[in-house]
Amino acid sequence: MYLYRYRKRPNFGDELNDYLWPRFIRTPLESEPGSDDVLVGIGTLLNERLPAHGTLHVLGTGYGYGDLPTEDAMRRSKVHFVRGPITAKALGLDPAFAISDPGILLHRTEDLNRKKDIDCAFMPHHGLCHDRMKQLCEQAGVHFIHPEAPCEAVIDQIGRSRKLICSAMHGAIAAEALRVPWLPVITSTEIVPDKWRDWATSLEIEVSFRKLPTIWSPPEPSVKGRLVAWAKGAVFQRRLSTLARSRHFRLGTDHRLTNRLTRMEHTLDAFNRTE
C-alpha cells in the first residue's frame, strides 16, 4: 500500500505518518506510488491533487490547500474517518466520520510520565523555523522545538514540557495526546485557522489564537530592514515571555480524548481485518 503524504521537506506532522502507521496498520507501506491501494493519512491532503489512480483509503485526513477532491477521486475513495467536522461537512460526509487527527494516537504509544524538565516550549510552523527564532526563544526563557527535527526528538521534548506554545498544529495535537497544556499562536499568514478548528472541534476544544510577529531570517540587508527586524524581534521576545506566564493554556478532557481514541482504534481494527 502506497503511503501518500507530503514529502518535499521534513516536518513533524507529515513525518508522523511514518512514525505512527506501522504501529497501527498491518499492511506494509511503500514510499513510492505503484500500488493499487493508497493510504491517505495525516495531513491536509484532501484536495484536487490526490493520486489519479488506485483505491484511496482515507484515514484521518483533512481538507484544504486547494479545491475539493475530484468526483473521480471520491468515487475511488474509501473514507474510514476524517480529521474533523469541517472536513466531513466539506466532503458531504456523515458527521460520524469526523473522529479526529491520527496524531492523537501518540497517547497510546508514548510514555506519558516523562520528567518535566522544560517549563515552557515553543514550536513554530515548519515554514518559519530558523536560528533567529531559536535565539529569540532562548532570550525569552522559552525552549525552542524545531519542527523539522526527528519525530522521536520532537515527541520527547513536548513530553518533557509543562506547557507548549505553538504555531505548528501537530505540535498542539502531540501536546494534547501527551497531556501537555498548549497555547496556539499565529506567526504568519501561512497559518490556516480552519485546519486547527477542524481538529480541535473533534475534541470539543475551542481554539483562540494569540499573535506573534512574523520573524524572517535573514532580515532585509538595508538599514531600515535591520531596524524593523530588531524591533519585531524585541516585540516577539517580549510577547512570547508574557504568553509563557499566561493562564491561557488549554487541554481537552480525558473523557473526550479516550472516546475519540477508542473510536479510532475500532475503525483501524476493522481496516486491518479487511486489508
What do these predicted regions represent?
Residues 1-275:
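Active-site anion-handling motifs in enzyme catalytic cores
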